[in-house]
């Protein structure tokens, strides 16, 4: 029974994401990534990494699903970066730049983060946010 409920929850999220995308694509409303970007720019927090993360987390928890690592797994990511102290990190997929911020604030000055993003839209938005 738990698996059926979980599957229903996942289907509900999936359907909501499709509807949200179609409505945004039609121009009826903004894409959620545009809304998050606008929040960051409107609140003038571009140079405040923690405030950017807090804004994205708040949006993801209280408004709608975002496909980023989030605050709980983000802490694990940061702890691993501190523990391993890597010289290079390859990030596949940037989306809003959330993980990029978490990674960059934990790298030493000699380390390198290389991020690859297939979507021009996500790339441009992450450049505005990070």
Regions inferred by a protein language model and the residue ranges of each:
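A short alpha-helical cap/connector motif
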Residues: 1-130
């Amino acid at each position: 029974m738990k698996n059926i409920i979980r599957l229903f929850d996942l289907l509900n999220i999936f359907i909501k994401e499709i509807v949200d995308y179609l409505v945004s694509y039609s121009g009826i409303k903004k894409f959620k990534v545009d809304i998050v970007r606008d929040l960051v720019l409107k609140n003038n927090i571009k140079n405040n990494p923690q405030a950017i993360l807090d804004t994205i987390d708040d949006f993801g928890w209280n408004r709608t699903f975002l496909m980023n690592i989030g605050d709980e797994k983000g802490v694990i990511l940061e702890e691993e970066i501190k523990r391993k102290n890597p010289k290079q990190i390859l990030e596949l997929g940037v989306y809003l730049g959330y993980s990029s911020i978490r990674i960059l604030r934990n790298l030493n000055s000699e380390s390198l983060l290389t991020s690859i993003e297939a979507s021009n839209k996500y790339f441009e938005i992450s450049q505005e946010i990070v």
